Amino acid sequence: SAKNDKVNYMNKVKEFIKEKKLIQNGDHIIIGVSGGADSVYLLLILNELRESMNLTITAVHINHMIRREAVDDQKFVQDLCGQLSIPCKIFEIDVKQIAKREKMSLEEAGRKARYDAFAKTMKKYNADKIAIAHHQNDQAETFLYRVVRGTGIYGAGAMREKDGNLIRPLLCVKKEEIVKYLKEAGQAWVEDASNQDDAFARNQIRNQVIPRLEMINEQAVEHIGWLCEDIKEVTTYLTDQIEESFLRCTKPI
């Protein structure tokens, strides 16, 4: 059944991509690859879809120049992309400098550096989508973090699977499914220390809160994900209705 599980996880994501129309045939996709489990898994899935959907894939790796392992991470990503014949663009960005200059935390500076690099690459290659490896656990953490920090219904929908040209094909799988898949496939990854977003609060939620919620119900993470889906559908509907009523009430001059 291990083989079946592996196929299942892949198919789950492929179905999700189809159902949510995240990728069209012939798309050029930029994918951020840190070398961590999540982005390696997403890279393998896009690579699986490459022929059938006639995709062009370009990987982007950001060397944050913070950790000693940064060079190893970069080499790992370059080697993996080499094996898959996927071009890989490397950005060396001094995140500490940015943080100092822009007066932001290292996490924020790292995120800014990543999205800037994605946008640049997208423009350069005239690509269609940027694929990010956020999964269900990230979604649950974001939701809980926003709820605790204070949010309204529009903020509670957390991350969308499609945000303009940004896509998140892994929002249908949990972290443990990703790790299980990679282990069974014999695929290595690097431990990703750059994931310490808003370090303290996020880590508390990841390491303390979610495990406790899973003690109450082991499907807690999926259930939060479903709630986020519902909220997104409701807010999208509301926004459309409000715009329609507004247009009905206003006359062209």
What name fits each language-model region?
Residues 6-33, 37-210:
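Core alpha/beta nucleotide-donor-binding catalytic domains of modification enzymes
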Residues 200-253:
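ATP/NTP-dependent adenylation/nucleotidyl-transfer catalytic domains that generate, transfer
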